[in-house]
Amino acid sequence: MHDDFLNPQTTLSRRHALALLAAPLAAAPALGVAAALPQITLAGPPAIVSAPLIHMAETGALKDAAQRTVFTAWRDPDQLRMMAMGGKADVLAMPSNVAANLFNRGAGVTLLNISTWGALWIVTRDAQRKTLADFKGEEIAVPFRGDMPDIVLQLLLTKQGLDPLRDFRIRYVPTPMEAMQLLITRRVSHALLSEPAVSLALRKTRSFPVGLIAPELHRGADLQQEWGRLYQRAPRVPQAGIAAVGAVRAQPQVLAAVARAYARSLAWCRDNALECGRMMSRHIDLLTPEAVADAIAVSLMDAVPAPQAREELEFFFGQLMARNPGLLGGKLPAAAFYGQS
């Protein structure tokens, strides 16, 4: 195991964030009849998992549960942790491992669903590179060191006997958009991206005037297919979903309404991809409606309730535990994490 698998800088930020743990928990009321909330704040990253949340906010999908619904974006996992622990949002889209880690460290987190099962690709200038092994010896730009999607990449590399540090030159960058910019400006030839950054990169390099100077880009290794091949499982990874934090967890009617609305909004986004893209582009800088529509077409999205996703999550978590238990807070999350008794 490499110490680099867990970013010391990120770990420090997590510890700093844990100082805020008591706030949302102290504010949580005892279980009882839920009154209509004045506001529900939804939050998510510039990724496809946020599309249903944005639709929910724009269409008033939770009007029976709250007087107002708003969406706010988080830019990186450290900001996500601070928002979750500081009471800055009620329902957040987040990587599955982050949700489990927060729960195991005592944060008030209830996973509602896993909805993103396939959104990770290596984007490359070389159309002939189709598996991770094809990138041996190459430099790859990777966002969010020690977090999703870096942890999936490292699992898949080590599973096939490759050393992430010796066999590759991993260039860590703060965000997926920065990895994409390195690709477009020819400063790297390969980058690990999630949707819709993948589709955005492919569209940008084919558009005027960027296309005059940018390289031709291709979808290279499909990390979902690599997962299925290496682990002899379905080619899907429980990458991200939505979780409730703080006081709203004590209102089961609200949680049920959120889960139902998310599933309906996801179905709407699949059926109305371009309009969904227009909604996302209004809330998240750099995204275009067309790139979001492309991303919806290729991503594996399925709003699986947390209890039904538990088996696949625990397999994924087991691989992370074997690699670095600290990624999950040292143990598998208990049944309460999944909203079970």
Q: What does each of the following model-derived ranges do?
A:
Residues 314, 318-341:
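Conserved C-terminal helix/tail region of periplasmic/extracytoplasmic solute-binding proteins
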Residues 35-173, 189-195, 214-220:
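Short, glycine-/small- and polar/acidic-enriched structural segments
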Residues 63-65, 227-232, 302-309:
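Short, solvent-exposed loop/beta-turn-alpha elements that line the ligand-binding surface or hinge
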Residues 97-98, 177-279:
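Pocket-lining segment of extracytoplasmic ligand-binding domains
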Residues 51, 82, 86, 100, ...:
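Solvent-exposed, polar/charged alpha-helical surfaces in well-ordered, non-transmembrane soluble domains
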Residues 56-59, 83, 138, 156-160, ...:
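Structured segments of extracytoplasmic/periplasmic soluble domains
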Residues 1-12, 23-27:
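N-terminal secretory signal peptides
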Residues 247-323:
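Secondary-structure end/capping motifs
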